[in-house]
Amino acid sequence: MLPIKEFQILNRIAALHHRSLPTYLTYARPWVKVGSEDRAAIIDDIAADHHDLVERILRVLEAEDRPIALGDFPMAYTDLNDLSLDFILQELTHYERRLLHTLEDIATWVDRDSDAFLLVNMAIGLAVGHLENLAEANGDSPAMKT
């Protein structure tokens, strides 16, 4: 049986990724200028990684037969509806940076010999990769070339 602390930590990580900004943006697409569709694909890629991580964590949590709470999207996300891809990619960079800091903090609470530690570190690795991809996508932005 998973210790309650680790269960709560994994539930928090699953919730952070299940109701993440990239996931929200798969439902409320930003405005994309013609020719920038390839840059917009990064949103779907990040959201897919978040979904896969949540699925992996849920397999562990569901075996515990305890209630799982993933929550709702934050209402603040609606402020980003219909904004440009350039702006959204910058917001996603800030979001992923905050997520990375949160995950690094959470990693300090977890026993290094646990499954939770492996999943937290997987989430950290994903966040680092997402930040690299976002930096590249933001570098391709016409707004960043002025």
Task: Describe the residue ranges of each PLM region.
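Short, contiguous alpha-helical
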Residues: 120-146
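Acidic/histidine-rich alpha-helical segments that form the ligand environment
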Residues: 9-16, 20-27, 78-126, 130
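Conserved alpha-helical segments that form or flank metal/cofactor-binding pockets of metalloenzymes
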Residues: 37-71, 133-142
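N-terminal leader/targeting helix
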Residues: 1-47
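Membrane-interacting alpha-helical segments
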Residues: 3-10, 85, 140-146
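Secondary-structure edge/capping motif, primarily at the C-terminal ends of alpha-helices
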Residues: 27-35, 106-110, 138-141
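Carboxylate-rich helix-loop segments that flank metal/cofactor sites and access channels
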Residues: 55-94
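Short alpha-helical linear motifs
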Residues: 34, 63-72, 95-100, 113, ...
